[in-house]
A protein has these predicted regions:
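Long C-terminal interaction/binding lobes of large macromolecular proteins
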Residues: 1-2
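N-terminal alpha-helical interaction blocks
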Residues: 11-166
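Cys/His-clustered metal-coordination modules, chiefly Zn-binding fingers
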Residues: 156, 160-274
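Extended, helix-rich structural scaffolds rather than catalytic motifs
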Residues: 278-281
Length: 282
């Protein structure tokens, strides 16, 4: 097959930025006060995307029947041993996360050096597995810097696994306020219609249907209040019984799906306002 000659060379097309990265950039332009937080988030998200391209799609050696049975027993679907972590990649990602947080002054020099030492520790796999199991219990973290770094390090591994599992089994009958995938607490919620709320795990980004009138922390159904912000795009459900709150995005009013990194940064001022009233994130 022949093609007609071209008079001039065509300029190469610019590759479009991924939606999440473009939305973060637009957020910083619209709200310059959020630019430092956006810059940090863009570095984290870019590193995650690069790692996930190298890792490919994970495979969990468990049948759909076994997954359904676990849900019925109230057990989380992803145990640490099933993830098959690539430890050289994990250690590299941990170093990258620590370096990013240090550049943005989230960590001081001493803390960064300590966390780099942990990343080189031969006992790192046991440390991470213990963190994974303790995070499912929802208790206070003894070492918040390590907890934050491990959460960011494991996220590209865990979110991809959660995506795969969520395609294989429905979690809509899961009755708990903790994630059916990894057992952690919700970090956000999605409102698709009035009274219909899906919680979104703060650790693996797994989703599950949960009663919009019930607090996922204490399961109280008569002490919740809901506030709207940003013209109703965001909502905050606060519980007067346990003093916890969960943020949500109304996807119809937003005109787009939840973008976890974008919406987390976009609602930082909302977090501060709710915390000033004595509430803590779930």
């Amino acid at each position: 097959m022949s093609y007609p000659p071209r008079d001039r060379a065509e300029a190469p097309r610019e590759r479009a930025e991924p939606r999440e990265m473009a939305a973060l950039k637009a957020l910083a332009e619209a709200q310059p006060e959020l630019a430092p937080a956006v810059a940090l988030e863009r570095e984290i998200v870019d590193g995650e995307r690069r790692l996930q391209r190298r890792l490919g799609t994970p495979w969990l050696d468990v049948s759909n029947d076994d997954l359904t049975a676990r849900l019925a027993r109230g057990e989380r679907l992803i145990e640490w041993a099933q993830l098959g972590i690539d430890w050289p990649e994990f250690r590299l990602r941990l170093r990258q996360v620590v370096d990013v947080l240090r550049r943005h002054d989230i960590l001081d020099a001493a803390d960064a050096a300590r966390l780099h030492d942990i990343g080189r520790d031969p006992g790192l796999p046991a440390i991470v597995e213990r963190w994974y199991d303790e995070g499912a219990h929802g208790g206070p973290a003894a070492d918040t810097s390590l907890t934050d770094v491990l959460g960011l390090t494991v996220r590209p591994f865990l979110t991809r696994a959660a995506e795969v599992v969520q395609q294989r089994v429905s979690t809509d009958t899961w009755p708990r306020g903790t994630c059916p995938m990894c057992g952690a607490r919700p970090g956000f919620a999605v409102v698709a219609a009035p009274g219909v709320r899906h919680l979104v795990c703060g650790r693996c980004h797994g989703r599950w249907l949960f009663d919009a009138r019930t607090c996922p922390r204490c399961l109280s159904s008569d002490r919740q209040r809901v506030f709207s912000a940003h013209d109703g795009v965001y909502q905050v459900a606060v519980c007067d019984a346990c003093k916890r709150y969960v943020k949500a995005i109304d996807v119809k009013k937003a005109g787009r799906p939840l973008l976890m990194s974008v919406d987390t940064v976009a609602t930082l001022a909302l977090d501060q306002a709710i915390a000033a009233q004595g509430f803590e994130a779930d």
